[in-house]
């Protein structure tokens, strides 16, 4: 499914929220895809998925969308400047893992701004290392990432972030 929230970043006011699949308020017990031959149990499971507000009730690992958080935290902490240069060979090895950039051959030399534009994993791994665990958690706290948004919608899930003491241990 798809979930989208559009909100005012200054005060958290929600302008729009949508979940897909969605349901008709006039026919809440009608599945979107009626072509399936489902048992009663399967139909109930599908209805519960359809009625669930995944925007606030589900948790996700954010992937590359979290790079804006890393960027903000690093710039605020002075761990990086816009013109700092980095080198992307196409991957970076962390412990026993090869973490790849989406550009297999690498971006080569690039500034921080170019690394953001390219969503370059090796650049962001270096930025995260410069920032350190404490700096990253400080930035996340300042941006409210580690707590509920406390919006006026029932069923908001808690964060799934690791505790700071367990990161890098």
What are these regions (language model features)?
Residues 2-64, 69-169:
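Beta-lactam-recognizing serine transpeptidase/beta-lactamase-like catalytic domain environment
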